[in-house]
């Protein structure tokens, strides 16, 4: 009997493999082919282009165990996680797919056979739903499978519009769609809930375990449903739900995976009660966070990284709630890898960087908590009334990671009410912003769709005859264009490389007698290559034969930069470690940009070693060899793949000696020696855990070196030396500058001491306390602290407020002697003054600083200080 989650996963894939399905690896959680998705959230995502007819595979049946995330965007389960039996941010979707192969009867039979024969689920515990008008599905279930009519439930348009139904699936407002049938499991009458379609259907008794979608229509913009020429099937079964059934439990959080993670989290934090909901949250969130980082997402303040950061902080908050006093979340990664089995292969390979990224985010969260307490204290001190507004509460939560319930606890101690409704409004607005982050809601159907194929000859030639098969003007198909028209021209065959894998599209010309079309870019449109540009002369029509000519110089320079990215990737892995993987690239004729995973800045010595290693491989003049092979064979040979790229079962492998082997469909030099020279121009971080190197090659590298030499010679002339003496002379100048700065600081201290002696006489006495309020002219902000200390020593029991203006800004300092801080706090005092000069600030009870942007209001602000102090000393 299959019981563990790992056993169920293997059994499912083996069942469909034995029934003629290609087992396809789970795709990345970062969708590689769909701009409308924030994260991969269903098994069919990686096959979307196949269903749309824009991609072809060498198989018509497939099966997967797809990793999915639902957090942020349209599909967001985050708020419910930990509080229900079945909501998760991360889950695995088991699925089988037919691309114009089998249809309803086979799909239904496969599902029923796996559940009742392979898993041996009792048939009397199962019932099914179908779309209201899908009589064909009813006949199959009833007559061919043998399900009683009373156990086949018809579901109509229960969402308020035509075809808006739990049992009618639609990819979007237009495009492939169709009815679906769902299989439900009855957990028993001791669990509350009703059959699907009943008023009690939201209960936990009847649980959907398998959804089988029949894609048989193409919905038009008019709403008309046209039959698809090749109907297809998309199915999905959540592994956590079927595991709960097989393991005899009623909550997903009681299955083997979660039991292990919950127990480990409790052990690390020191919790004895394993039923704590916070432990569920932590166990769920470590799965989504770890796998997202493994797939290249890093915590940040925008897009996918923003959602990841929120999930991490939610988990850490629940850990703190349970009493965690130090970073704990990252310590769950080894247990996660162990319990996920084969599904954690990619995670195991990136374990080091995943743990470092999680730990860094946890530690940063701890620092923001401390800052949040300081911000909250200042906000409460400035509060007028008894209610802290929701926007401030949300700012503390969202910007500083400060939990709302902790804010409420602090407020209760001061008899202050928290505006929870305002907080929820601000939270809802931020959720909307997160959904829109990175424009992930773009209309997929807005892309130009071209029903054609173009053969590529550009690996071996840069010019050749071709026939025009289609022309698109302003997004519409036309038969001809005239001079001056900007259009996309499709050919039956082309030497032009279409942008892919970081390499920009080729430029060049399409020419014939009296015709010249300037190609400014080349892009892929499904299986077709689109030549984007302007018709300079003549007229061009579909069916004409032209000569396609790639710009040789631009292609050559691009190839230098592309080939060297392979060498750079291999060199980085040698120097920094095998955790380095490519996260993106840009290769054009002028330069290259290479993004890679690494948890810290690359040291100067490491950069030098990388550069030297690449240039060594260039000098060795390796021949670049390409070969077509199966994806599994390529992986066995150690070929590295590009982050976010999709690969067919047959791939192209590029090898450079024994130094580099990668999957790549781009164009390259013949030998590494053609690159000439490689020079790194910059290295920087672009996100947490992601670094970027920019570099140049060939003639551009020589020009860069020449420019550096010219700048060095110019610097030498300014220092009155030569290139060989620049460093020594510069060091001497810096030493001299440091000495002058030291002397200047000493002089300022003397001036401050002298000024303090003069200022003592300006103090007034209020109820036996020396009070000094002064606007200072010509005093730098950096001198205020020392001056305040001098005055405190001379005035003893005193309250001091000093202000100065410099470059259109106000600088303030307040000092209160220790015997008076029970009555007057420097932080409150300086904040009061700062508010009147367009600024803010705070600090300790005995000393605080602030700034402002309205120097014209400084005199009036200082005039308010004495009454303010007098009131508190009364």
From Swiss-Prot:
The Gene Ontology CC terms held by the record are: cytosol
Q: Which reaction(s) does its UniProt entry say it catalyses?
A: tRNA(Ala) + L-alanine + ATP = L-alanyl-tRNA(Ala) + AMP + diphosphate
UniProt key word tRNA processing? no
**EC?**
6.1.1.7
Location in the cell: Cytoplasm
Molecular function terms from GO? alanine-tRNA ligase activity; aminoacyl-tRNA deacylase activity; ATP binding; tRNA binding; zinc ion binding
Q: Tell me, what is an example of a GO biological process annotation in this record?
A: negative regulation of DNA-templated transcription
Statement: the UniProt record of this protein carries the keyword Lipid metabolism: no
The Swiss-Prot or TrEMBL record lists the needed cofactor(s) as: Zn(2+)
By sequence similarity, the record places it as follows: Belongs to the class-II aminoacyl-tRNA synthetase family.
Q: What's the stated role of this polypeptide?
A: Catalyzes the attachment of alanine to tRNA(Ala) in a two-step reaction: alanine is first activated by ATP to form Ala-AMP and then transferred to the acceptor end of tRNA(Ala). Also edits incorrectly charged Ser-tRNA(Ala) and Gly-tRNA(Ala) via its editing domain.
Q: What is known of its domains?
A: Consists of three domains; the N-terminal catalytic domain, the editing domain and the C-terminal C-Ala domain. The editing domain removes incorrectly charged amino acids, while the C-Ala domain, along with tRNA(Ala), serves as a bridge to cooperatively bring together the editing and aminoacylation centers thus stimulating deacylation of misacylated tRNAs.
Its recorded name reads Alanine--tRNA ligase
The species is Shewanella baltica (strain OS185)
């Amino acid at each position: 009997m299959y019981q563990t989650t790992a056993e169920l996963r293997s059994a499912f894939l083996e069942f469909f493999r034995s029934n003629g399905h290609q087992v396809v690896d789970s795709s990345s959680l970062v969708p590689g082919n769909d701009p409308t998705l924030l994260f991969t959230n269903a098994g069919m995502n990686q096959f979307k282009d196949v269903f749309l007819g824009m991609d072809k595979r060498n198989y018509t049946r497939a099966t997967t165990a797809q990793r999915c995330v639902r957090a942020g965007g349209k599909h967001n389960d985050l708020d419910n996680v930990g509080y229900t039996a079945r909501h998760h941010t991360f889950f695995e979707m088991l699925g089988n797919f037919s691309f114009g192969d089998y249809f309803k009867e086979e799909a239904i039979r496969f599902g029923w056979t796996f559940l009742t024969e392979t898993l041996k689920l009792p048939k009397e515990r199962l019932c099914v739903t179908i779309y209201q008008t899908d009589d064909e599905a009813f006949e199959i279930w009833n007559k061919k499978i043998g399900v009683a009519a009373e156990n086949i439930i018809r579901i109509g348009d229960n969402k308020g519009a035509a075809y808006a139904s739990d049992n009618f699936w639609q990819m979007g407002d237009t495009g492939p769609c169709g009815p679906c049938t769902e299989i439900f499991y009855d957990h028993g009458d001791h669990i509350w809930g009703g059959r699907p379609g009943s008023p009690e259907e939201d209960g936990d008794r009847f649980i959907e375990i398998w959804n089988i979608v029949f894609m048989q229509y193409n919905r038009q913009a008019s709403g008309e449903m046209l039959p698809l020429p090749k109907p297809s099937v998309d199915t999905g079964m959540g592994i956590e739900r079927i595991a709960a059934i097989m393991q005899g439990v009623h909550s997903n959080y009681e299955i083997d995976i979660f039991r292990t993670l919950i127990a480990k989290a409790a052990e690390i934090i020191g919790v004895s009660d394993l039923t704590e909901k916070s432990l569920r949250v932590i166990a769920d969130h470590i799965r989504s966070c770890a796998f997202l980082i493994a797939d290249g997402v890093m915590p940040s303040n925008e897009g996918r990284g923003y959602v990841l950061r929120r999930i991490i902080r939610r988990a850490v908050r629940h850990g703190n709630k349970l009493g965690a006093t130090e970073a704990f979340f990252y310590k769950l990664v080894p247990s996660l890898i162990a319990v996920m089995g084969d599904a954690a292969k990619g995670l195991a390979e990136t374990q080091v960087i995943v743990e470092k990224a999680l730990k860094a985010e946890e530690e940063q969260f701890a620092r923001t908590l401390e800052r949040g307490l300081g911000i909250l204290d200042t906000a409460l001190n400035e509060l007028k009334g008894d209610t802290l507004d929701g926007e401030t509460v949300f700012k503390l939560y969202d910007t500083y990671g400060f939990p709302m319930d902790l804010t409420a606890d602090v407020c209760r101690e001061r008899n202050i009410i928290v505006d929870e409704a305002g907080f929820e409004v601000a939270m809802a607005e931020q959720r909307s912003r997160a959904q829109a982050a990175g424009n992930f809601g773009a209309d997929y159907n807005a892309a130009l769709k071209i029903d054609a194929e173009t053969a590529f000859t550009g690996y071996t030639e840069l010019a050749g005859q071709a026939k025009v098969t289609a022309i698109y003007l302003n997004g519409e198909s036309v038969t001809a264009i005239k001079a001056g028209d900007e259009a996309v021209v499709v050919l039956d065959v082309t030497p032009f490389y279409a942008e892919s894998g970081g390499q920009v599209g080729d430029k060049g010309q399409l020419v014939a007698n009296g015709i010249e079309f300037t190609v400014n870019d080349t892009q892929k449109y499904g299986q077709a290559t689109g030549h984007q540009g302007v018709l300079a002369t003549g007229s061009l029509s579909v069916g004409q034969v032209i000569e396609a000519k790639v710009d040789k110089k631009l292609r050559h320079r691009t190839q230098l930069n592309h080939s060297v990215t392979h060498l750079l990737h291999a060199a980085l892995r040698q120097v920094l470690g095998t955790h380095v993987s490519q996260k993106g690239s840009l290769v054009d004729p002028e330069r290259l940009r290479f993004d890679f995973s690494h948890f810290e800045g690359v040291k100067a010595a490491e950069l030098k070693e990388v550069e030297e290693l690449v240039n060594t491989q260039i000098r060795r003049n390796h021949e670049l060899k390409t070969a077509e092979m199966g994806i599994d064979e390529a992986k066995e040979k150690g070929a590295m793949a590009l982050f976010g790229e999709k690969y067919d079962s047959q791939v192209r492998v590029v090898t450079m000696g024994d130094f580099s082997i990668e999957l790549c469909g781009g164009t390259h030099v013949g030998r590494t020696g053609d690159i000439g020279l490689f020079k790194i121009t910059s290295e920087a971080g672009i996100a947490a855990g992601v670094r970027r190197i920019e570099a140049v090659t060939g003639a551009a590298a020589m020009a860069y070196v020449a420019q550096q030499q010219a700048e060095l010679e110019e610097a030498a002339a300014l220092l009155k030396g030569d290139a060989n003496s620049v460093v020594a002379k510069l060091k001497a100048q810096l030493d001299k500058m440091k000495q002058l700065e030291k002397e200047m600081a000493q002089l300022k201290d003397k001036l401050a001491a002298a000024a303090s002696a003069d200022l003592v006489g300006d103090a007034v006495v209020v109820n036996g306390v020396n009070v000094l309020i002064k606007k200072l002219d010509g005093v730098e902000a950096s001198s205020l602290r020392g001056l305040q200390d001098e005055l405190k020593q001379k005035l003893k029991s005193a309250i001091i407020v000093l202000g100065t203006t410099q470059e259109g800004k106000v600088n303030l300092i307040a000092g209160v002697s220790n015997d008076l801080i029970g009555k007057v706090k420097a932080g409150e005092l300086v904040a009061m003054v700062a508010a009147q000069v367009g600024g803010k600030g705070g600090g300790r009870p005995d000393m605080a600083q602030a700034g402002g942007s309205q120097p014209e209001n400084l005199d009036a602000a200082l005039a308010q200080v004495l009454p303010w102090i007098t009131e508190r000393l009364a």
